[in-house]
């Protein structure tokens, strides 16, 4: 058993509480090396019980006012867990002991619901076979890793008769589908002094924390959105460019294959270009965790990059956790599937799990990105690329760097920008000297396809190798420091540039989700060039080239047709992806994020000739 000592000064004191998932079962969205959620919590003593309470930080009013009283009466906190005291107060310190086992051997993460959603089976936490695997306690952090056992007593018998509704299969990646272990790393640490907040603006894409202030009814809008961002302060506030007092440190986990560590490091440090323009030199630092290091990268004190894998996985994700009072980012952990760097033949295009996340909270490149990689390598292999040769290795590392840059962007607070890919025309994106400096797109935060030129034409970079103009601008808006009393003026000067083409922004809600597509044909995932319709035509042309080459491919005697079938399907997937995006032109509307006083309209219908061109493409 493990006991926690709680001092009287720690009762009613706010703490940052989070959980991460170091180990899971490796299928259907349940993977290891994933971040969980976080809360602002307090320990509260009720009789002999000590409760772990998640405080409601969404709604507040100034302490001591009548408004603060009615807010506390109107909205509830939440009980995360509770346990009985196991000691009398210490005679000198007055501290008490509680049993960590009974406090944390509960389903605080709500993983039973996730298991039920994935398998439609009533898995329950088995506390008798749940245990602690590691603990860490310092003045800055208390960390405990729980190896939780989830089980179900029996599997459902198959139906006696066939059904038009297919049954959800049980787990297939565990030796026995009735039993599985999942690890949770719980972190509890003191909150920092509140950081100075910065108000969000809809013209720049940052993740935000929202708080509703009921102190006064004079405001039309009581809800305020603060940027999620790291605390960066200059060592020399008077210098135009200064190193920060505390840089943002990314720890490379010791589970990253050695041949990819330099590429991952390069992807992280690429963002220092933007931070230097915003006034910070060496804002981002990369450190390698050694085998002898005794800390866990899954704790809340270390921003990290980790590898993971699974039976059906091929995605990367870059979430972050912030102080709900101010938006200060306190932790971030990038999870990188080895499917991004392994051979394209390893990627399971047919049945990839789809990470879920409302309003762009999670990076959802999984299925389409894997299809895109498979398609690109199919076509390049058909043109003569050797998948086990140096050119393919360089391509895989370039793709890895691009992915790391994208995910690091999320961990510094940036949302997707799905308008960014329309900045340059199709000719410009094959000018390698230009794109190495400026990027193919105005932002790495777009979902960008492989840049493949038509047969016989000039080939530029296959993937984006640096950050774009929008990325520099967004970092400047989020992180630039100003002299006392000058912040509002300085931020407005930055925002005044938002109408410039290379700085325009639209995100997940604008591009649409699932079967619901947006109204602006220039805001899409996986398009490229200033004329998306021309790009869709190019992709269809490339698919026809792939099919023609596959027609003449000779398989070795005894070789399976599966490889050929999958390659044909990757070409058809391009057509399937292009058709609904081309349909956005028909009845489509170009949108703009403008403020009152602008001469540019907020909405502009797509030209009729362009609509007819799109219709002709779809109906061919």
Task: List each model region and its residues.
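Solvent-exposed, polar/charged alpha-helical surfaces in well-ordered, non-transmembrane soluble domains
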Residues: 262-269, 273, 398, 402, ...
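Sec-exported extracytoplasmic/periplasmic mature domains
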Residues: 269-280, 310, 410, 414, ...
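Auxiliary tRNA-acceptor-end handling modules of aminoacyl-tRNA synthetases
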Residues: 1-256, 274, 278, 283, ...
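Conserved catalytic/binding loops enriched for acidic/polar residues
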Residues: 390-391, 395, 420-620
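Short, charged/polar "capping" segments at the starts of alpha-helices
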Residues: 258-260
């Amino acid at each position: 058993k493990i006991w926690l000592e709680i001092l009287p000064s720690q009762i009613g004191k706010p703490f940052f509480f989070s959980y991460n998932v170091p180990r899971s079962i490796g299928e259907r969205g349940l993977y290891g090396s994933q971040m969980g959620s976080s809360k602002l919590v307090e320990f509260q003593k009720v009789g002999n019980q000590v409760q772990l309470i998640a405080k409601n930080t969404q709604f507040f009013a100034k302490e001591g006012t009548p408004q603060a009283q009615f807010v506390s009466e109107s909205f509830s906190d939440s009980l995360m867990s509770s346990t009985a005291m196991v000691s009398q107060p210490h005679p000198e310190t007055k501290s008490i002991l509680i049993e960590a086992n009974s406090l944390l051997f509960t389903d605080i993460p709500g993983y039973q619901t996730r298991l039920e959603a994935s398998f439609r089976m009533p898995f329950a936490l088995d506390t008798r076979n749940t245990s602690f695997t590691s603990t860490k306690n310092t003045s800055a952090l208390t960390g405990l890793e729980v190896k939780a056992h989830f089980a179900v007593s029996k599997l459902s018998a198959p139906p006696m008769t066939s059904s038009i509704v297919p049954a959800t299969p049980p787990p297939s990646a565990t030796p026995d589908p009735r039993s599985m272990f999942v690890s949770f790393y719980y972190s509890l640490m003191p909150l920092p002094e509140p950081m100075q907040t910065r108000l969000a603006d809809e013209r720049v894409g940052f993740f935000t924390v929202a708080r509703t202030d009921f102190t006064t009814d004079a405001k039309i809008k009581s809800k305020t959105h603060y940027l999620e961002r790291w605390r960066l302060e200059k060592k020399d506030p008077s210098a135009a460019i200064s190193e920060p007092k505390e840089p943002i440190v990314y720890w490379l986990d010791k589970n990253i294959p050695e041949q990819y560590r330099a590429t991952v490091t390069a992807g992280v440090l690429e963002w220092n270009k933007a931070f230097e323009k915003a006034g910070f030199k060496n804002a981002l630092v990369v450190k390698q965790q050694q085998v002898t290091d005794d800390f866990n990268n899954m704790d809340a004190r270390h921003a990290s990059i980790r590898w993971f894998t699974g039976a059906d996985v091929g995605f990367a994700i870059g979430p972050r956790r912030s102080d709900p009072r101010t938006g200060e980012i306190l932790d971030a952990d990038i999870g990188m599937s080895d499917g991004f760097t392994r051979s394209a033949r390893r990627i399971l295009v047919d049945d990839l799990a789809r990470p879920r996340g409302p309003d762009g909270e999670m990076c959802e490149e999984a299925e389409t990105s894997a299809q895109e990689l498979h398609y690109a390598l199919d076509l390049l292999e058909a043109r003569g690329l050797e998948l086990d040769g140096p050119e393919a290795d360089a391509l895989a590392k370039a793709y890895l760097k691009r992915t790391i840059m994208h995910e690091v962007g999320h961990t510094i607070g940036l949302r997707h920008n799905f308008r960014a890919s329309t900045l340059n025309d199709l000719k410009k994106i094959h000018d390698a000297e230009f794109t190495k400096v400026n990027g193919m797109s105005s932002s790495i935060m777009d979902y960008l396809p492989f840049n493949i030129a038509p047969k016989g034409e000039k080939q530029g970079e296959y993937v984006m190798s640096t950050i774009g103009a929008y990325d520099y601008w967004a970092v400047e808006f989020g992180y630039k420091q100003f002299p006392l009393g000058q912040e509002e003026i300085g931020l407005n000067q930055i925002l005044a540039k938002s109408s410039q083409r290379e700085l325009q922004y639209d995100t997940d809600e604008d591009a649409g989700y699932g079967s619901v597509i947006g109204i602006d044909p220039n805001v899409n995932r996986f398009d490229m060039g200033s004329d998306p319709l021309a790009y869709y035509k190019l992709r269809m042309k490339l698919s026809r080239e792939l099919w023609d080459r596959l027609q003449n491919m000779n398989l070795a005697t005894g070789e399976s047709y599966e490889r050929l079938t999958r390659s044909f399907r990757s070409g058809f997937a391009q057509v399937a992806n292009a058709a609904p995006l081309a349909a956005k032109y028909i009845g489509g509307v170009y949108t703009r994020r403008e403020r009152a006083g602008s001469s540019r309209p907020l909405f502009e219908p797509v030209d009729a000739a362009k609509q007819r061109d799109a219709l002709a493409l779809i109906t061919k």
